Amino acid sequence: YRGCRWNGRTNSLGLNNSRVEKMRSKDSFVLPRTGTVLKNRTVLAAMTNKQSYENGILSEEEKKWLIRRAKGDFAITTTAATNVTETGRGWNGEMGVWGDHHIPGLTDLATGLRQSGTISLAQLFHGGMRAPKSINGVQPVSASINTEPGMDGIYTKALEHNEIKEMINSFADAAVRCEESGFDGVELHGAHSYLICQFLGKITNRRDDEWGGNLEGRSKFLREIIKLIRERTNPNFLIAVRISPIIEKAGIFLEDSLELAKILSKLEIDMLHISCWDVFQKIESDSQNRSLTKLFRGVIPDSLPLISTGAVWTAKD
């Protein structure tokens, strides 16, 4: 799986196992659902740089930082995590997409990225149990009552049904703002134990209603976000979904993640992004000694491109 290096966090787009070996990182790539042409198969993943103002507005430094990296010839450039609500920030200096006052800065960034020749994705995010009260001034929320190291011993409030619906709307509102600003699409951050991930995990989601229980219930939050974004944006607006294959402390295990990939492949998304940390690492429990990347590629159809992250340092990789 080929890619290009950037600050240790790089990605490559894959097809199926047989065709990937015949492609090079510099080869162009067509996203099947929309026909969007990517100039090559490299993707710059979201990286946290903490340069936005307290109100979530982009600073000039942050715009320049990302545009400069986009000029490294990446086919897709992803922003840092952008928060969909004012009280879901995971850290200081985080980009915001929760209000219309963010649109001018987002427009400047999207324009600069387009002029750099890259496809732009804004990564949509909510910290959930990883949104400290010390930053947001309110009790954090999650799928269930949870806590997290670094949260000063504060437990989350489990979201009520109407609050879940409001949160889904917040993600969709943010996607609409990104489209209005000129972004080519969004990436839903369902990895790394943030809010979407908290709904997916068996340990972080202990609900017994329609938003919990089996994988169908635990994935409903993510699926409803995808459906509403698709309803409210242009058909050619791109949606990528990022997930973590394994986070044992959250109750996310490989078997469920592979099944989730199958579920997501039936929705109108354009890319599945797995955060592997090392795309070459083999899975000990796999009888064929395959990597996570190959395992996921093997369970989703060719019509859904796969982005895999981690330890891609050179074109040879």
Residue locations for each model-derived region?
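Flavin-dependent oxidoreductase catalytic cores
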Residues: 3-317
